[in-house]
Amino acid sequence: MNKRFFTLLSLLFAVLFVSAQNSDVEKMLKDIKAVTGFEKIEKADTTRQYYLMKVTQLLDPQNPAAGTFEQRVMLGHRGYDRPMVVVTEGYGADYAFKSPRYMEELTKIMDANILFVEYRYFSGSTPEPCNWDYLTVANSMEDYHNIITSFKPFYNAKWASTGISKGGSTSIFYRAYYPEDLDVSVPYVGPLSGAVEDGRHESFLERVGTKAERD
């Protein structure tokens, strides 16, 4: 009888603890002005609380009259005293948002929180109407800056950015635009093209293999 009682009591305390944690994170999200909506999402990783958020961004930070759009961001909350890893995705982020088993490597290594930011003009972060004039590196960096400065007051440990492929390039760009926002940047791959036809590899592609293979 006593054993069953203490088991039930332990379960009750666990439920209350998780509920209190959820309420605390959700209160923070409600307090952040840029966050205009969020929903809790389930992941295989039970050590973090995951939320898919909508963040209101200016289409053109230099011209607020141009309007706004909603950008999708995922928060994986580990603890306010833990580091924060910002994934500067260069494209759409459905693979991270929808996969229950997605885990970013640095987040796991550092036992960190995660902010996964989908790039503007991709998937669920596409403005309506879709005016491509506002898809610039400078405007995209302002998106990240707005998100990071909105969350920094709540997470006081170290901040890192990371990305792969175009996300790696984006991580480099962000470091150049706002070096004081982050403590470290870890671009896994960061291709930097000089032009539509870069000029550094075309001559190789014109010679490699046989003519039939190239054609």
Where are these regions (language model features)?
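Conserved alpha/beta-hydrolase
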Residues: T107-G124
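Alpha/beta-hydrolase active-site loop
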Residues: Y134-P153
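Bacterial Sec-dependent N-terminal signal peptides
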Residues: M1-D24, L205-E213
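Catalytic-loop region of hydrolases
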Residues: Q21-A112
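Alpha/beta-hydrolase fold nucleophile elbow
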Residues: Y155-S165
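A catalytic-pocket lid/entrance helix-loop region that shapes and gates access to the active site
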Residues: L182-D215
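Short glycine-enriched nucleophile-adjacent loop
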Residues: G168-E180
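Catalytic nucleophile serine of serine hydrolases
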Residues: S165-K166, V189
